[in-house]
């Protein structure tokens, strides 16, 4: 998908090709998921995962979910375009150790900071670790 993204940015391919590539990637992930999550892994905790409000991309998030399930974590997948309030409510309900936030669009990256601020306001920030990820995310942003 990195190559597809670069070709799209360079104008070599367009939205229809991007959609076909994403669909193909998802089908491939569906095939390998049982292999990645097979076996008896010790339960290591609960991770809430979601793509932030305004972003509809989930391939990277879904890859991380498969790897974390394979490592023994229970995953609560909130999907894409997740509202801050819904993330906060789920953190309270699930008592998770980790919250994973995903963004592919640079325009949605500020939502991650808003989620962290909302966690602080709700008195939840020190109760869990927050992981941010996505193609545009780097160490400086994190």
Regions found by a protein language model. Name each.
Residues 1-141:
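Domain-level signal for soluble alpha/beta catalytic cores
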């Amino acid at each position: 998908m990195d190559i597809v993204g670069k070709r799209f940015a360079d104008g070599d391919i367009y939205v229809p090709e991007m959609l076909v590539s994403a669909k193909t990637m998802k089908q491939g992930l569906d095939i390998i998921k049982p292999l990645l999550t097979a076996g008896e892994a010790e339960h290591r905790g609960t991770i809430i995962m979601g793509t932030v409000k305004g972003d509809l991309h989930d391939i990277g998030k879904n890859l991380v979910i498969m790897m974390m399930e394979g490592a023994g974590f229970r995953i609560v997948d909130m999907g894409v375009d997740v509202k801050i309030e819904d993330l906060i409510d789920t953190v309270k309900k699930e008592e998770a150790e980790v919250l994973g936030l995903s963004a592919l669009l640079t325009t949605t990256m500020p939502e991650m900071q808003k989620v962290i601020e909302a966690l602080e306001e709700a008195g939840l920030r020190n109760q869990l670790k927050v992981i941010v990820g996505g193609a545009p995310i780097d160490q400086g942003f994190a």
